[in-house]
Amino acid sequence: MVTNHIQKEIFKQDVDPLCRLCCKENKTILHIVSGCEMLAGMKYTERHNKICQYLHWCILQDFHIPVNTDWWKHKPKPAVLISNKVSVTYDLKQEVDIAVEANRPDIVVLDEKEGRALIIDVTIPMDINMVKAAAGKYKKYRDLEIATKNNIT
């Protein structure tokens, strides 16, 4: 993808390398995909929500819960769906026995039958930030993981 920054630095064209939206950073792929503060409030959130929507749709299908045939038409609601001792919550505060600061992940799959819980909180970092982002999410939800385990065992 040829950005203004590439046109200026590689092709030596006389163009302004700054992002036209924020006018603060050079318009690089990294900036467009995950760094522009003007896109942060809308496009990044929209991308995050679409991924959560798709994951929620897939999870419900795996548990044979009826859903729309097209994932993009699926409308997850912050509610609990229960089927065979399995609950799937979407953007819902998790109720546990102890006070937990981070208690609202994107999706939680609670399988009481198997004694397992899956906590999903989506982040979409650039490749270079993947390990840091994963570690941050793990740390953020560690207390919720422990409290949830205690509730189902």
Positions of PLM-derived features:
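Helix/loop segments that flank and initiate small ligand/metal-binding modules
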Residues: 1-26, 50
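Active-site metal-binding core of divalent-cation-utilizing nuclease and nuclease-like domains
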Residues: 13, 66-119
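Metal-dependent nuclease catalytic cores that hydrolyze phosphodiester bonds in DNA/RNA
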Residues: 23, 44-61, 65
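Cys/His-coordinated zinc-binding microdomains
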Residues: 23-24, 37-40
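Short functional micro-motifs and their immediate structural scaffolds
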Residues: 27-28, 41-44
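Short beta-strand-loop-alpha-helix junction that forms the active-site gateway
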Residues: 104-105, 115-136
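Nucleic-acid nuclease catalytic cores
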Residues: 146-153
